[in-house]
């Protein structure tokens, strides 16, 4: 950690605590491009990306942000080279195993969102263990979107609701936003106030399509492995200058 990074362990004076987003989501883009620029294999970009995420999680905790959601693996990521996918599955499992004790000690509550049944069974076991051992923690809520797709999430919610209607457990006129949200992967998690996307790409990439209806979006050209507290500080400064209207004038 640089001197500048150390200085940012406390909430910067130009940020107002009452105006901080309660929930930040991140699309961690640019690991492969970062590795290519460094003349390294793509997998090294993913390893550095894990370090960047760990620092962001601690930064959110240090600065009083209540929730962080990270887009770790999309439903489309299965189309990547098999070697890279297998590495990512192994990396997720290893990081969970190595970091769980520290997460428990730091009062982090871990939650995974997505179609988890399609993941390797060994990874599913680590995911279940991490959620079970941190379920009573009341610090920052850390959600990891894994095998997640926004369209698929909405479709599965519709199917689940339709099945309840068919079974007579729910009446059509009882279906509202609250009922719908209870059937999403993110049930019980507040909508993000701020979505940060790295690497300069300007799209949602099938991430939190329902939940981002009124969220603010911040795009940075910085590649994910280079995203640090200084970059996060810039994102929060930009967020605090915006006026959130939630569809109102």
UniProtKB/Swiss-Prot annotation:
Cofactor field: Mg(2+)
Top enzyme class: transferase
Cofactor binding comment, as recorded: Binds 2 magnesium ions per subunit.
Binding site for substrate: 30-34, 42, 46, 74-76, 78, 80, 197, 203-205
Family indicated by similarity: Belongs to the UPP synthase family.
Subunit structure, interactors included: Homodimer.
Protein's name in the database: Isoprenyl transferase 1
Gene: uppS1
């Amino acid at each position: 950690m640089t001197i500048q990074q150390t200085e940012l362990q406390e909430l910067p004076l130009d940020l107002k605590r009452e105006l901080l987003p309660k929930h930040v989501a991140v699309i961690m883009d640019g690991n492969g491009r970062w590795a290519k620029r460094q003349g390294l294999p793509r997998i090294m970009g993913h390893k550095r990306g894990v370090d960047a995420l760990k620092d962001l999680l601690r930064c959110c905790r240090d600065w009083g942000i209540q929730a962080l959601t990270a887009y770790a693996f999309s439903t489309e990521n299965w189309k990547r080279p098999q070697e890279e996918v297998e590495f990512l599955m192994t990396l997720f499992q290893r990081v969970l195993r190595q970091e769980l004790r520290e997460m428990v000690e730091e009062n982090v509550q871990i939650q995974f969102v997505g179609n988890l049944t399609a993941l390797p069974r060994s990874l599913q076991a680590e995911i279940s263990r991490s959620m079970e051992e941190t379920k009573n923690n009341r610090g920052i809520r850390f959600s990891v979107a894994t095998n997640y797709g926004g369209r698929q999430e909405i479709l599965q919610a519709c199917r689940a609701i339709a099945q309840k209607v068919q079974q007579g457990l729910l009446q059509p006129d009882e279906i509202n936003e609250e009922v719908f949200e209870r059937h999403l992967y993110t049930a019980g998690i507040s909508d993000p106030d701020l979505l940060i996307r790295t690497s300069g790409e300007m799209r949602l990439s099938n991430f939190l399509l329902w939940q981002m209806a009124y969220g603010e979006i911040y795009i940075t050209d910085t590649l994910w492995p280079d995203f640090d507290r200084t970059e996060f500080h810039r994102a929060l400064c930009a967020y605090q200058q915006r006026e959130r209207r939630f569809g109102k004038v």
